[in-house]
């Protein structure tokens, strides 16, 4: 047991100076699974790491292992279906499909314009992802109309929208 405490550290501790950042894409099925856990994650984060920073990209990175975009899409949809079943995430098991382009634009507008912050924003983010991935386009359209009529874009450091290539959701410290 004394060896454990005296052994050399193999990796430097991660710095938390910049907090915790998650990169998402609205049309990425792994992002859909990840946002279902963000509320719980935020509750257990220490105050030193908060607020959780969220970066939403509209650009997909190149698929891995020389896969085509179609092969990657099919693979990720099947993989996410298995993960969702194993971990009890919400997921369309009948016929999972990517959200349509109009719905993606509406979802981004809703998220850009909402004044909600912290945990309330995370709840909205999860709801918007559910609407996208469960093809609840009527609900999404209603929120979109409200957002465009009553809100303006919010510029918050913990919420950013950009075009950096993201293949699948990931965290960065």
Predicted regions and their residues:
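Short, contiguous strand/loop micro-motifs
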Residues: 25-26, 67-68, 160-162
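Structural alpha/beta surface segment adjacent to cysteine/selenocysteine redox centers
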Residues: 33-133
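Generic signal for short, ordered secondary-structure residues
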Residues: 7, 17-21, 59-63
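C-terminal cap of thioredoxin/glutaredoxin-like
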Residues: 1-8, 19-20, 31-43, 116-173
């Amino acid at each position: 047991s004394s060896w454990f405490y005296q052994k050399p550290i193999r990796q430097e501790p991660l710095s938390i100076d910049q907090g915790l950042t998650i990169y998402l894409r609205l049309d990425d099925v792994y992002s859909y699974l990840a946002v279902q856990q963000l509320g719980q994650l935020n509750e257990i984060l220490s105050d030193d790491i908060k607020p959780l920073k969220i970066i939403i990209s509209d650009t997909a990175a190149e698929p891995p292992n020389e896969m085509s975009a179609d092969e990657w899409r099919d693979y990720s949809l099947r993989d996410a279906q298995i993960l969702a079943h194993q971990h009890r995430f919400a997921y369309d098991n009948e016929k999972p499909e990517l959200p349509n382009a109009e719905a993606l634009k509406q979802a981004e507008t809703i998220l850009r314009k909402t004044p909600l912050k912290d945990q309330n924003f995370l709840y909205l983010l999860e709801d918007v992802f559910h609407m996208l991935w469960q093809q609840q386009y009527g609900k999404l359209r209603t929120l979109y109309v409200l957002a465009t009529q009553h809100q303006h874009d919010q510029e918050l450091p913990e919420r950013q929208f950009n075009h950096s290539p993201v293949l699948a959701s990931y965290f960065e410290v």
